[in-house]
Each structure stands twice: as C-alpha cells, then as structure tokens.
C-alpha cells in the first residue's frame, strides 16, 4: 500500500483496493486509453466516431492490442499505432519536450495518465494476480511482485515470474499482459 499511496500522492492515479476497469483479454486499462485519446487527439477520436459510431472504442482497442502483439510495448509507446480509419499513426504517449515552447506537445504531455493498480487478475485461464501493474495511458508498462522481508525473498519473486507467470500456458492462448512479440 505504501508504494501505491506514494505514487498516488505524486501524480499517479491509484484506486484502492483494485482496478475494476482492466480488460484481461486485451491487457489494457480501457478508460485511461480512451480518455488519453479523447484529450490528446480529439480530432482523431472524432474521426473514429464519425466512421465507426459506437464501435469506435472497439476499433481503437483492437488496433492497439494488435500492434502490441506485433511490435511490443516499447515500440507502440514510442511510435504509436496504425488505426484503420485514421490517416496517420496515433501516438499513445507524449514525452516531456526538451523545450516548453510547443503548447500542443506540452498539453499532450500533461494529459498522460500514469496509473498504479494492485492485484490485477491478468489471466484468461485462472484467477492469478500480479501484485502491481504500472500503466501509461492504459498500456501496461511494468509489473511488480511484492515480497515481505519477513517471509519471502527476491528469489521467491524470481521463481514466481519464471514458473507461475507463464506467458503461454501449456495448450492455451498466450496471456496478453505477459506476452512479448517474437
């Protein structure tokens, strides 16, 4: 709790006890992604809505998941995603500008949504949880397994990631949160 509260008091979004809006199937915190696009790229969002109506959200989520599967998180955050119906790739984050001269970039940078969520049920196959997930505009960028000094060690956390957090359980579809493109 201390980690989450500290992040929450320093600009991160933290809702206790658990994040209800996490989409296990797509491994995206949907409201943050949609809000980011609506605030940072209102023209792109309006274009998606005019082309797809009530399916605009699904169109965006599917494109993001596809690109995450193909390119990986870092490339998607750095380069954006191709969304059918938009003329150019849609950036999913804005980095702090070296100079604060461009108001539009600064506005998008300030619109970034950083979220910390506890006990994320990530699996499509069971109720396993990851202790902490850090999100940037709805995209998971890091996972953390917490251990106490009294009963567990870092070796326990490493073992848990290696053995209990399989990206592709035997004979099943990959876990989106744990999968990386090959």
Whereabouts are the PLM-identified features?
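An alpha-helical interface "stripe"
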Residues: 1-182
């Amino acid at each position: 709790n201390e980690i989450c509260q500290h992040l929450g008091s320093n600009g991160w979004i933290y809702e206790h006890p658990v994040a209800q809006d996490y989409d296990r199937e797509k491994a995206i915190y949907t409201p943050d992604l949609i809000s980011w696009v609506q605030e940072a790229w209102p023209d792109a969002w309006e274009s998606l809505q005019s082309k797809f109506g009530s399916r605009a959200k699904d169109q965006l989520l599917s494109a993001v998941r596809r690109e995450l599967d193909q390119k990986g998180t870092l490339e998607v955050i750095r380069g954006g995603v191709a969304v059918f119906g938009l003329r150019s790739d849609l950036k999913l984050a804005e980095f702090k500008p070296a100079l604060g001269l461009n108001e539009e970039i600064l506005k998008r940078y300030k619109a970034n949504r950083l979220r910390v969520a506890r006990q994320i049920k990530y699996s499509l196959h069971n109720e396993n949880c990851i202790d902490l997930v850090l999100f940037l505009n709805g995209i998971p960028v890091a996972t953390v397994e917490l251990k106490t000094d009294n009963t567990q060690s870092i070796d326990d956390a490493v073992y848990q990631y290696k053995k209990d957090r399989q990206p592709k359980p035997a004979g099943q579809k990959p876990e989106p949160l744990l999968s990386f493109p090959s």
